[in-house]
Amino acid sequence: MRLVGSQYKDMEDRLSPSARLVRSPGSQTRIHSIESILGFKGETLFHPAFPYGSGKTGKDTEHLSPKKDSNKHFDGVCRSTVMVSPDLPDADGGKLSDDENPKKKHRRNRTTFTTFQLHELERAFEKSHYPDVYSREELALKVNLPEVRVQVWFQNRRAKWRRQEKLEVSSIKLQESSMLSIPRSGPLSLGSGLPLEPWLTGPISTSSSPLQSLPSFITPQQAVPASYTPPQFLSSSTLNHSLPHIGAVCPPYQCSGFMDKFSLQEADPRNTSIASLRMKAKEHIQSIGKTW
C-alpha cells in the first residue's frame, strides 16, 4: 500500500532514527521514534558526551568499565611475565669478559719460534717425518717447548711438505707437456715423422765419385788414407763393375803432425784382427776360384 502526502512524510519522521524533538513555544510535542518507544530518554539520547545513534545507555557504560579494568589487569600480567631473567646480564651492563664466560672457546696465542728452535726442528724433520713420542719429548726439552707444540709443528711441517711435493710434480708435468707440444721443423722427414738433417737426405748414387755424398765437414782428402789398401776380395773381377778403384779416385791423404809420428796401423788396435780377416778372405776367394 502506498501512502500519499503528509501521511507518508509523518510515517518517515516517526520511523527515522534521526527524529528530533520538535518544541513549540507553549508545549512539547510527543516524539514517535524507535528511541522513545524503547524507553530511551532525551537527555541520554542527545547527551553531548555520546554521538547520536550510538545506542549506549548508562548501563552499557557501567558494563564497559569492568572491561577496562580487566584490560589493565591483563597488561600487568603480560608485563610481569616478560621480565628480564636475573641470570642474564643487564642491557646496560655490557658483555661479559672472557673469564666470566666459561662457554666461550679460549683462543691460544700463536707460538713464535726462535732461529735455534726452527733449526733443531728442521734437523729432526729431515731425520724422520713421523717422530715417536719419546723423540718429541726429547726434542721439546732440547728446544724448551711443550711437547704438544712440537707435535703441532710436525703436523704443519708435513702438510707443507706435501704441498711442495705436489707443486714439484705439477711443474714437472707442465714442463714435459710443453716440450712435447713444441713442433720440430725439418726439411724432410721419413714416414716415422723423425726429422733428418740435409746431408742425410742427399741422393745416393753409384756414380764414379761416391765420396760426393759425404758430409760437408769431411773432405775427400780426409775420407780415405793413402796407406789404406782394400782387401783383395773387394778388387776381384766380380766387383769391378760396381766399385771403382779407390786409389785412382782419392788423392794422397795428408796426415797431420801427430799422424806422422804414429802410423795408422800402429794407432789402430784392431790391426791384427783385420790382417787375419784379410788372410781368411784371400784363402776363401782362392778356394772359390779353384772350384770354378
From Swiss-Prot:
GO cellular component, one term: nucleus
Listed Pfam families: Homeodomain, OAR
CDD domains: homeodomain (cd00086)
SMART domains reported for this sequence: HOX (SM00389)
InterPro entries: HD, Homeobox_CS, Homeodomain-like_sf, OAR_dom, RAX/RAX2
Source organism: Danio rerio (Zebrafish)
GO MF terms, alphabetically ordered: DNA-binding transcription factor activity, RNA polymerase II-specific; RNA polymerase II cis-regulatory region sequence-specific DNA binding
Protein name, entry field: Retinal homeobox protein Rx3
Motif segment (OAR): 272-285
Family: Belongs to the paired homeobox family. Bicoid subfamily.
